Swiss-Prot record:
One of its GO terms (biological process) is translation. Belongs to the universal ribosomal protein uS7 family. It comes from Nitrosomonas eutropha (strain DSM 101675 / C91 / Nm57). GO terms for molecular function: rRNA binding; structural constituent of ribosome; tRNA binding. One of its GO terms (cellular component) is small ribosomal subunit. HAMAP family: Ribosomal_uS7_B. This is Small ribosomal subunit protein uS7. Part of the 30S ribosomal subunit. Contacts proteins S9 and S11. Keywords: Ribonucleoprotein, Ribosomal protein, RNA-binding, rRNA-binding, tRNA-binding. The keyword Transit peptide does not apply. One of the primary rRNA binding proteins, it binds directly to 16S rRNA where it nucleates assembly of the head domain of the 30S subunit. Is located at the subunit interface close to the decoding center, probably blocks exit of the E-site tRNA.
Amino acid sequence: MPRRREVPKREILPDPKYHNVELAKFVNVLMTRGKKSIAEQIIYGALSHVEKKSGKDPVEVFTQALSNIRPVVEVKSRRVGGANYQVPVEVRSVRRSALAMRWLRDAARKRSEKSMDLRLAGELLEASENRGTAIKKREEVHRMAESNKAFSHFRF
């Protein structure tokens, strides 16, 4: 634990086009090598593809996809008497969003479409309908927590 004062959370401003804070955070997650404008182009392109394909509000599809991907529980390793146990713990709300965004990004990168905005659009549409690789990742994490429920008394 750090002995200094607690570092204040930075306030993230909403994105310029849709005025959504979660979208602005996702831009930062998607960004590589500090190229924020390219990350914004990819996301806005993906959202326009989502609007064309589904006919729904793209920001609503994005928030629905994120809420479907967010994990409720995860496992943490805990060493007890020479054995490592996978202990299920509840995920804090900030970490839920961060994990969901990371899993969405990784799932989109693994897809086979030609450009990143098409990949992201496809993954967003699938995740909003509870399908896709990112949802599989969440289910896998939940399954691990469920199978290790017996060790939940080893609290942190």
